[in-house]
């Protein structure tokens, strides 16, 4: 019984990862680097780039969104990989 209980505790710890949250950069364009803790178990970061009347625009954040044609998208799976 003790072995079963210990096994359940270990499996729970491994599955929950002790509350660790995934971290991605979230600064826009040429702003100083900032990060955000991703919610909902998200484990990907993205960087979107496009040009408009303001010039070259960069957006960073958690997840991997769907983008329109003409927008460059880079999604990655390690923390802070989207700088």
From Swiss-Prot:
SUPFAM superfamilies: Snake toxin-like (SSF57302). Keywords: Acetylcholine receptor inhibiting toxin, Disulfide bond, Ion channel impairing toxin, Neurotoxin, Postsynaptic neurotoxin, Secreted, Signal, Toxin. One of its GO terms (cellular component) is extracellular region. Pfam families: Toxin_cobra-type. Expressed by the venom gland. Residues 1-21 form the signal peptide. InterPro entries: Snake_3FTx (IPR003571), Snake_toxin-like_sf (IPR045860), Snake_toxin_con_site (IPR018354), Toxin_cobra-type (IPR054131). It comes from the Eukaryota. It is found in: Secreted. One of its GO terms (molecular function) is toxin activity. Disulfide bonds join 24-45, 38-62, 64-75, 76-81. Belongs to the three-finger toxin family. Short-chain subfamily. Type I alpha-neurotoxin sub-subfamily. Binds to muscle nicotinic acetylcholine receptor (nAChR) and inhibit acetylcholine from binding to the receptor, thereby impairing neuromuscular transmission. This is Three-finger toxin W-III.
